[in-house]
Amino acid sequence: SRWDGSSKFQKENRWGMFPSAALAWRISEENFMESTRNWLSNLKLRASFGVTGNNAGVGPYDTQALANIKYYYNYGGTVANGFGYTMINPDLTWEKTVEFNVGLDFGLFNNRINGTIDLYNKNSSDLLMEMQTPFELGSYTGAIISNVGKVNNKGIEIQLNTLNVQTKDWNWETSFSFARNINTIKELNGGKEDLVGNKWFIGQPIDVVYGYKYMGVCTREEAQAFANDPNMKTKFYEGEMKIYDKDGNGEIN
């Protein structure tokens, strides 16, 4: 277990405890595996659990107000010095990731063939991300760093290495790898409400893209038909891309 501190956060959120543990079982060294030792060089099962903290993306003054006199404002034709206002978030804290990993290491024929298989499950909470905010709230950047929600990452990683030829003068080795990760947003701002402005949707990956379904290019005849159709609230013109009207009400929204 370890304690980490960061001066980027306020005093009450500065320190975080991040425990971890790991164990392994070298199965190939057990007595009941003695008959396999002429071809099985290594077989090890391992498991680990750990909590890690992240403060990347947080600036040294994101929890403290700054005054900057380099901003100028026009008041009735008179230019005056002013203070650029940056929104702060004094409640920022560590982003935490709890990870559980199970892995298998193996080696065959004096490790001429060897590899690893890893399964992992990560749950990240208090994600530190830039959240879009209306300019009228006082942020000239339109964004503020916040602890916004929870995300799950789970997947598999496979690595296979082979020593195909080994001579006094040269070796021929090959490596193969495969990885698959599934990223899912579980919670945002303590609830199940999507943050559309950030492209964050519950049950979907971070920064998933939603868009209209296009049905091809509008022809001259189709454009005339759209123009003459009183039920068609959204008009398409010649050369434009036609958008699929999912609910059939004549309006794209």
Predicted regions and their residues:
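Extracellular/periplasmic, surface-exposed regions of secreted and cell-surface proteins
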Residues: 1-213
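Flexible glycine-rich, low-complexity coil/linker segments exposed to the extracellular/periplasmic environment
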Residues: 70-87, 201-253
